[in-house]
Amino acid sequence: MTAPETRTAPFGRMLCAMITPFTSSGALDPDAAGRHAAALVADGCDGLVLNGTTGESPTTTDAEKAALLRAVRAAVGDRVPIVAGVGGPDTRHTIDLARQAERAGADGLLVVAPYYSRPPQAAVETYFRRVADATGLPLMLYDIPDRTGIRVEPETLLRLAGHPRVVAVKDCAYDLLGSTKVIGATSLAYYSGCDELNLPLYAVGAAGCVSTVANVAPRQLRALLDAFDAGNTAEAARINRLLTPLTELMTASGLPGTVTAKALLGAGPVREPLQPAGRGATDGLRRAYEELLTTTGRCPSPAPVP
């Protein structure tokens, strides 16, 4: 077990991959975003990740991304770090987004691997280095091959770890062996980006998690990490088991995490081509959530977002 004091966690342990609230007409709702962010911080989140996969970033404009960041910064102040998602198939646009995020008040950048064109690893490395050199912000590299079509290979991460502003990885690669090797060989802070792997990755030395489930169950996730850090691994495993039914429905049911999180929160529509969860899926999510509250203690849920 990795002692808490030996973990490198530049953005905190438990980060929420925050949804992006929209109004009933589909417009960005910065006020609702601010309320949700403040509730997440009150319920134990150490940091917030905006404009990521759960935040429907492919459907928001550059201006909306900046407005969301400013609204959340105004709501939470300097209490927690805010990491802004950037990235795409165009290095120039990614750099523009990174500089915009820095101006809007981000504390770090979540930089997704360049998707669609599927460049070779040498080009992937160059892409990340160019973004890292473009601002003064620390980078969390986002390895999510199911969405991008390419891995950020462990060997590439080992080389990038030498860059002074490459400090962390959001790991959605489902490669526990590869992740463990990089954790052991570098000072990169690993964050689980797949809720079902939060505890396994934490057990092998990860810094924490960037969680979709944290939108609705932040206190339970905080309790899991606290139990593990206190040496009570049995309690951490128990909480993890209790979270599993909800985690499965939210992240592995075939519905995107943002759809399921918004269904539970009543957080407004998703943007097309995504579609809202149906009645049956929503009812199942609510049953799993109520069961979680019953078995873990009725923690206050995040403030509903109109």
Where are these regions (language model features)?
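Active-site beta->alpha loop and helix N-cap motifs at the rims of alpha/beta catalytic domains
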Residues: 2-149, 159, 299
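Flexible, active-site-adjacent loop/turn segments at secondary-structure boundaries
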Residues: 9, 13, 17-20, 114, ...
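Catalytic alpha/beta core domains of metabolic enzymes, predominantly
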Residues: 133-134, 145-247, 251
